[in-house]
Regions:
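Entry/capping segment at the start of metal-dependent catalytic domains
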Residues: 1-60, 73-75
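Metal-dependent phosphoesterase core characteristic of DEDDh/y 3'-5' exonuclease domains
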Residues: 2-4, 60-63, 67-94, 98, ...
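Alpha-helix capping and helix-coil boundary motifs
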Residues: 29-48, 93-96, 100, 142, ...
Length: 240
């Protein structure tokens, strides 16, 4: 039986720190240095704290989920378009569909239910737990366990998750690490990172209303991940 593959990747943004309630601000700021002792260090670490809000599903949210079928070279990006309501569009076999966070998470888990193999870059430790928490916040139950059995590559029955960040570092055994950009560079794959858009620029792009640009960047991520998987599949995957 042919296994149905799904490459996936997400984009997130953090909350606006200044708009948070005071109790939450104080809780987040507990570890900051004494402002009266070192104002410069305090301000520096406060800015870093604000920058890192995106990395927690408690202080951030999903604004794009990209999915891609590497066998058919087709995919979709479900993305948050703010208050605008753009028409669905398709560019180079990638559909772009505007949705709110709850809708895109519901769509992802519906797709997950009918796929067998999942491919990501750093998805087991980052994307999947993030989506699971955000899903629970919206009252959505995941349909697959994509975090368990890391070393065996086995998750829930009939589901396999290939996290390339883990696999290419031999599950942490190797002394080196690499970003998706560096792995793509090494294998001659077009990198999704550009001067205009990269992971650390998504937050500002979202504030600026560049929703489709973020979605297109996410599409480049899933395509690059699919190409990187092809290298791993051909040259690293154990032959059974």
């Amino acid at each position: 039986m042919i296994k149905k593959k799904l490459v996936f990747d997400i984009e997130m943004v953090g909350e606006d720190f200044d708009s948070m309630d005071e109790l939450t601000k104080q809780d987040l700021m507990k570890s900051l240095p004494d402002r009266a002792v070192d104002e410069k260090r305090y301000q520096s670490e406060l800015e870093e704290l604000k920058r890192k809000l995106v990395f927690s599903p408690l202080t951030g949210k999903v604004i794009a989920i990209g999915v891609y079928n590497p066998d058919e070279s087709k995919g979709a990006v479900y993305y948050d378009a703010g208050k605008s309501k753009p028409e669905d569009t398709e560019i180079d076999n990638i559909k772009y569909v505007a949705m709110n966070e709850a809708e895109m998470l519901t769509k992802f888990w519906a797709l997950a239910e009918v796929h067998d193999e999942f491919i990501s870059f750093f998805g087991r430790r980052s994307d999947v737990p993030y989506m699971m928490i955000r899903s629970a916040i919206h009252g959505i139950r995941p349909t697959r366990d994509l975090t368990s059995n890391r070393y065996a590559n086995l998750a829930a029955p009939s589901a396999v998750h290939y996290d390339l960040a883990e696999l290419l570092s031999f599950n942490g055994l190797a002394m080196y690490r690499g970003s998706l950009h560096r792995w793509c560079r090494a294998f001659g794959i077009d990198t999704p990172k550009t001067d205009e858009m990269a992971g650390d620029k998504v937050g500002q792009a979202y504030k600026d209303g560049k929703y489709l640009e973020i979605a297109k960047y996410n599409a480049l991520d899933i395509i690059a991940t699919a190409k990187l998987y092809d290298y791993w599949d051909r040259y690293f995957k154990p032959q059974l």
